[in-house]
Every structure is written in C-alpha cells, then in structure tokens.
Amino acid sequence: MSKAETIRSAKLGKKELRLVRMNGRYFGLADGVKCAEGENADDVWRQLHDDAGERFLTFFPNGFHSDGYASQERDYKLAAKVKLDDTATLEKAANGTGFGEAILAIFRATNMLSPFEKTRLQDVLRGPHADDFVQAAARFTLDVSNSHLLAMEQALKPHDNAKWTVATYLPYLWRPDTHMLRKPKATKDFSTRVGHRFASEYEARLSLPVYESLLDLAEKS
C-alpha cells in the first residue's frame, strides 16, 4: 500500500475538504469521511465540492453571506479563544488556581463537545478537582508528556469524563498551531481511508502514544 498524499484541500463552512491520492486512485474526504472516489483528480474534487456545497447551502441558502454563518461557524470559536486568553492565560493557568468558572464558560462557548460532556464538566470545574484539571491541561499544552495527560485523566475520571474531546479541547484553543482536537470517529475514519497507523493504534483511554499518532496524522495529511 502506498502512502496517502493530500494533494488539495479547502474549507467549505465548517467542513474541511481534502483530495487524497493513494494506490493510484483519488479520494474526496469531507471531515475525514469519504464522499467521492475515482481515477481522475479533477472529477473527484468536483464531485466532493458539489456534494458538500449542496449540504452547506441547505443550511445557508446565501452561502458565506448568509445571516448567521459567521457566528455559527467561525466567530464563536475565535471568540472562545480570545476569552480563554483573556481570562486564563496559558502561563497563569499552568500554576494558578481558581480558574474553574472561567474555564467552564469557555467549554460552554462552543459546540465542540457533546451536551453530556459539558454537563459532567460542570461537576469537574466546580468541584475539588478543578485546579488539578486546569493545571494539567495547561501543562500538557506547554509540554506534551505522559505525566500531564495522566493528571488530566485522574481529575476527569471520577466524573466519568476522561474523554479525548475534553482532554484536547483546551490545548487546541490555547495552541491551535501545535495541538489537535480529537474527535474519535471522524479521525479514525479518515486515518483508515488514508492508511495511517492511527486507526489501529487508537484506544478510548487517554494515552500519549495515541495522541502522538494523532499529531503525526495531522502533520502528514
């Protein structure tokens, strides 16, 4: 099996479109899910873009100029990062205390987590493990190490919320240039289709090798 190669990419709404070449064929992916396949790169890209565009226009009939597009698909995430940087700077969060309510507001500011995860986070960030979790997340952002990931797991596990989306959310907002938000299903689907080892190495438990594999997938895609 040849190495998968991304030869073209674009954004359409919140969707990330990629044209990937592997084993002499071309695959059109929308957020890691295969939507088109063929032997001609231009045809596959056109089909992928047309299909994704039709779904996008279902929700935003006037395209990128539709009322509500910016607030729903872009601005609220940028606003969450600005608010995080203003209320809990990375350096202060790594060693400070009392950031629980501020961090809870950041989690509530986007739809990147499930309602169940957000509900459990309220117990985490208003309970005795709040400082432990925030400090561990900040330290993991600064230094991707097993000890910091384990510290996050220990703070989240009593509330049944040691999930990849929760653990990677703050690092992604603090340092989007070096960290990735892990959404297991989409990431596994994409890695399977492009032949990356992440699909076979993935496990639900927070594990440093899994996260390092994710970063490798992002770098090579």
How should each PLM-predicted stretch be described?
Residues 167-174:
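Short, hydrophobic/amphipathic alpha-helical patches that form generic packing surfaces
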Residues 2-160, 176-221:
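An N-terminal alpha-helical hairpin/helix-loop-helix interaction module that forms a charged
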